[in-house]
Amino acid sequence: SFLKIGDRAAGAIKSGGTTRRAAKMVCLDLDHPEIELFIDWKVEEEKKVGALISAGYASDYEGEAYRTVSGQNSNNSVRIPNEFFEKLEKGEDWELTARSDGRIMKKVPSKALWDKIAYAAWRCADPGTQYDTTINEWHTSPKGGRIRASNPCSEYMFLDNTACNLASVNLRKFFNESDNTIDVEGFEHTVRLWTVVLEISVLMAQFPSKEVAQLSYD
């Protein structure tokens, strides 16, 4: 599938001698007809890893066992609307629908699907969960369109074809242990300064497409 092709492409970028490995987020709506396969993808692949390690292959993440299987070059997440949790509370089935015309392709017990997500997350740390309804309720630019995905680590949610640069602030530097106070003014100044710095860095970046460049600028 194209999902596995994208995974291999990211792996090639990672091993291409660059200073930073590829970063890729893959999101799938919970009502997608192939959602069960998506949830189980890494679970099944890591079973193969276990078999290869038992056969004597290296167990480190850069070793042959992990390089051999798919699904190791992205963060996978499922987009869950509030409607699913309503079905879950009532013990009702969840409908999987065709992307082209919305036809119901299959009904699955909502609890079984939720248990599958929980088991997969425990077994191999994926998929992550993104709460689609809440994310779009908190959308700061709703007229621009729906938020359908995030950056690879899921801390930045925004429109399709937009870019983000990230920074971190050491909060301990603003905390005075002698009197248990926080330098609020210093923190506010730092946040304002870094917001400007990141805006400039985004605008100075080289974008992969005209659409990404324009929406990042706007």
Model-derived features with residue positions:
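Active-site cavity-forming subdomains of large catalytic enzyme subunits
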Residues: 1-189, 203-217
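Long, compositionally biased non-active-site segments enriched in small/hydrophobic residues and glycine
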Residues: 189-198
